[in-house]
C-alpha cells in the first residue's frame, strides 16, 4: 500500500497534466484557449470559441482524467485519505500541467470525475446542483462555486469517510475561482450562453 499510493499520486498528476482543451483546439484548428475567450483552457471557454462538439470532447476527457486514477486506486484498496490526495493530484495537474508550461484550467470537470467513484448517487446530485445553478443563473462559474461549497455536505451524507478529502478538493476549486467570485460580485462575469445571443442581421426591405 505504501508503494502504490505515491505512485498513483504521480500518475494522477501526469494524467491531469494532459490538457484536453489545448489538444482539441489544436486538432480542430481553433485558437489556443489560453489566449482566447476567457483565457481558461476548459470546456466552457472551448464552447465559446469552438462550439458544442469541441467543448463536449474536452468535458468528457477532463472528467475521465480525474475519474480513472481515483477509480483505479479505489479498486486497489487505497484508503480514503490517499484517495483524496490522488484526486487533488489530478486536479493540480489540470490546473498546473507540467506538459503545458503550468498554464491550466480551473479543475472543475476533473474534480467532478475524481469524486464520481464515491458513488453514482453522489454523482447525480452533484451534476444536478451544477446544472440547476447554471440554468437559473446562466453562470457556469457560479455552478462550479455552489457545487464546490455543497460537495462536502453531500459526501458527508452519502459516504462520510470521504468528507475530509472532498473538503480539501473543494477548497482548491474555490481558490482557483477567486477571480470569478470577484467578477460575479461586480456583475462583470460572462454568462455561458452569451456567445449564442448574437443579433441576427436585419433583412432589407
From Swiss-Prot:
Oligomeric and partner information: Probably interacts with PlsX.
Pfam families: G3P_acyltransf
GO annotations of cellular component type: plasma membrane
GO biological process, any: phospholipid biosynthetic process
Protein keywords: Cell inner membrane, Cell membrane, Lipid biosynthesis, Lipid metabolism, Membrane, Phospholipid biosynthesis, Phospholipid metabolism, Transferase, Transmembrane, Transmembrane helix
Protein name (database record): Glycerol-3-phosphate acyltransferase
The protein's annotated pathway: Lipid metabolism; phospholipid metabolism
Membrane topology classification: Multi-pass membrane protein
Enzyme Commission no: 2.3.1.275
Record-linked SMART domains: G3P_acyltransf (SM01207)
Transmembrane segments: 4-24, 80-100, 112-132, 138-158
Locations listed in the record: Cell inner membrane
Catalytic activity, as annotated: an acyl phosphate + sn-glycerol 3-phosphate = a 1-acyl-sn-glycero-3-phosphate + phosphate
